[in-house]
Amino acid sequence: DQKGQVKRVFGGDIPMERPVINFFDRETTDVELKQRLALKALDFLEKDQLVAIDGSSTNLQFAKNIPNGLKLTVLTNSYSIAHACSMKDQVDVIVLGGRLLKESMTNVGETAASQAALYHPDLCFMGVYAIHPEYGMTIPYPDEVSIKRQLIQSSRRVIALVNPIKLNTVSRYHVCGIEAFTTLITDNDVSGEMAVDYRNKGLDFL
C-alpha cells in the first residue's frame, strides 16, 4: 500500500519483506535493546546445560552476558558467539563446521546441519530475522535453512530473542512455523494485541 506496510500478492496481502542487512551492520545497531533482551534470557540458563546458540547479533549480546562462573557447554555455528563464549572460564564451546556464510558470519549448509544432528541441546536460542504468527520464521539466505531447522528439531526448548521491528514481518525462505518455538522474548513496549497473536499459537511471550 501507500505506506509501504504490506506488499500485494495473489490471494491477499502479506507483510512487507524485511530488508537484507549484513551481520556487521546489525551488530552495531540497537545494542542497548539487544542487551535488555539478553538479560531477560539469562534466567533460562542452568548449570551443566548443553545450550545451542544460533548466529545472530542479538544472540551475540546474550553470549557476552553469560555469567563467567556458570558451567555450560555451548554449541554454535557462529564464530563471533564462539569467541564470546571462549572468554568465559566455565563455558566449553563446540563449533559446528560447514561453509561460512559471510553475510551472517555463520557456518551453514548440510555439513553444519549433519553435525548439529549429533546433539540434543537442553535449550536453543534461535537467531530470528523475520517472524510472523501466520507465516512463521523466514530468513533471507537459503543456505541457513537446514542448520536452523536441525537445531530447532534437536532441541528440547527453543527460545527466540526478537527485536520488535522483526515481529509480523517476512523474508524470503521459510524455516518453520511459529509453533516450533516455546518462548519468544521481546521488548516490554510491544502492544498487548500483538502479543495475543503469538500466545494464541502456544508461545510464552515475554
Pin down the residues of each PLM region.
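Short amphipathic alpha-helical segment that frequently serves as the phosphate-/nucleotide-binding helix
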Residues: 60, 79, 141
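HTH-adjacent hinge/linker in prokaryotic transcriptional regulators
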Residues: 1-52, 63-71, 86-91
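An N-terminal domain-start capping segment
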Residues: 35-36, 75-76, 172-173, 177
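Short acidic/polar alpha-helix capping motifs at helix-coil junctions
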Residues: 2-6, 24-28, 45-49, 76-80, ...
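Conserved donor sugar-nucleotide recognition element shared by glycan-biosynthetic enzymes
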Residues: 34, 55, 78
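Conserved phosphate- and dinucleotide-binding cores of soluble alpha/beta proteins
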Residues: 8, 82-206
